[in-house]
């Protein structure tokens, strides 16, 4: 996953560096040593994955992204079969983002690829992160929607199937 310099992506890339933190928030410098398979980095990734799965629905068999989902791949690599979290999962309704795009809030991991794509291509805010913390979701900017002819590209950018195509949903 690559993005513009200085842009952080989803927190599923924890590595051990001289200064601990998410790998995507720092640039690799000459002579820098990065340990991606150290015990500390693996433990950090396990923790991040557990948090990402707390409210993520277990609907992989019917998800349009099934078999091509980064989160599904990480979960299988991890060998995770259950969760320590016993509370009911939060349920949020599906939102219509306009055009052919639906937003399945429960699947979103807030990687912000869609937000950054729309900012870069449209040159003004169309999508944004609404709320904070565990209530954060992707939302539409005021008086904006995804009606531009190329806006449906955000569906392909979404790594977990949170953005789906109305005409091709569940097909």
Please tell me what each predicted stretch does.
Residues 26-171:
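Fe-S ferredoxin-like electron-transfer domains
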Residues 4-5, 10, 14, 23:
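Short linear motifs in low-complexity or flexible loops
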Residues 17-18:
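Basic polycationic patches enriched in arginine
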């Amino acid at each position: 996953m690559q993005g513009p310099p200085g842009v952080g992506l989803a927190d599923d890339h924890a590595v051990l560096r001289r200064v601990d933190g998410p790998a995507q928030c720092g640039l690799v410098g000459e002579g820098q040593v990065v340990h991606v398979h150290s015990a500390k980095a693996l433990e950090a990734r396990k923790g991040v994955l557990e948090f990402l799965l707390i409210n993520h629905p277990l609907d992989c068999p019917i998800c349009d992204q099934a078999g091509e989902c980064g989160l599904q791949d990480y979960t299988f690599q991890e060998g995770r079969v259950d969760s320590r979290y016993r509370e009911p999962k939060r349920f949020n309704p599906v939102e219509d983002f306009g055009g052919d795009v639906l937003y399945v809030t429960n699947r979103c991991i807030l990687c912000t690829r869609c937000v950054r794509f729309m900012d870069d291509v449209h040159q003004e805010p169309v999508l944004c992160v609404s709320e904070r913390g565990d209530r954060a979701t992707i939302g539409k900017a005021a008086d904006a929607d995804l009606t531009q002819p190329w806006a449906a590209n955000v569906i392909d950018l979404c790594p977990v199937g949170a953005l789906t195509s109305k005409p091709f949903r569940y097909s």
